[in-house]
Amino acid sequence: PAILPPDWVFGPWISANHWNTQKETEKQIELLKKYQFPATVLVLEAWSDEATFYIFNGAKYKEKPNGAPFAVGDFDYSESAYWPNPQEMIEKLHKAGLHLVLWQVPVYKQQGDDEIRNHQNDLDREDAVKRSLCIHNLDGTPYKIPEGHWFPGSMIPDFTNPETCKTWFGKRQYLLNMGVDGFKTDGGEFVCTDAVSFYDGSTGKESRNYYPQQYTKAYTKF
């Protein structure tokens, strides 16, 4: 049987890519009151470090290798110019009747030469290769998104592999523990060839169109 999502999902959603600080985000609460707009969901697009896509921008922390998960208390936001207290922000949003949804994309990102190296992202990429958490070419090498596409050079997680799901969502569980209400599953149209293989034995021929479903299904289960 079909299961309906919670009622708040059916209310008005608000989002803007330039809401990239706690100050700007909390400003929306006042604007909603001022204009009496009955939003139920606020989506943050530019909230993360733009590398791991699961850590608030500006957070300080001790990097973790081998796919180890993070906990709420692992992060220090006191010096962040972007999100000095995301826990407090989430509580304010909830008090205002807003549910927080965070933007996601299914990549182990290949950072550009003009970007500051994110060492946690490097560790995650190494772990994905070492434990075969990503999709592979038929010769066994990691598949990388081709040039000319979004996130070129990035590897993509293989959600048919239980270990991938365990590690990927283990990294994001602390966000739910903070009170985050959901995730916007952007992207996913990254399988650009038939010549790739998945953990479950399928190839790109079956999964070019099926991969976005695997991606959203994994998040729904999470």
Name each model-derived stretch:
Residues 1-222:
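Catalytic-domain carbohydrate-binding cleft regions of carbohydrate-active enzymes
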